[in-house]
Amino acid sequence: AAADEAGRPVLVAGSMGPSGELMEPMGTMTPDSCADAFASQAEGLASGGADLLWIETMSSLDELEAAVVGARRTSERPIAATMRFETAGPTMMGVTGEDAARRMIDLGLAAIGANCGNNIAETESAVVQILSGAGDTPVIVKANAGVPEFRGDSLIYSGSPEVMGAHVQRMVDAGVSI
């Protein structure tokens, strides 16, 4: 595998994203059915060689918790988790960075943070909130390089390498480690 050929220590993260369903009472997904789905994914990722499990782009803390419960049923791999924050600040389910940090810390995750988002400033704002409650837990930032748009046959992101480099430096300076 590519990780074995890297010539340096490499961790392979098995990614699991949101189900696309809403938890009861707003939707039909139960915590148990959600956990079952994530257990199956975690088992496959672990047997495929993932060193850690990465639950990402979540908007609901209840779904995130069910995903963690499910993943822990079938794997002892460390778990990192990130949430997606929206234009007004919280996730689409109303979760703030502070709320996310508290719940993710309570779940005993190996690393916590934010990913995706509509723009870098929103992601940075959420990450600063997460940092304030993270304690010694490593914090992750994985922002989009802007909102993608089609130009002809190409999908283009507005964030240049310079914009992304400045973003990364701000986050490192703030205390982000992943």
Regions found by a protein language model. Name each.
Residues 1-178:
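Domain-level signal for soluble alpha/beta catalytic cores
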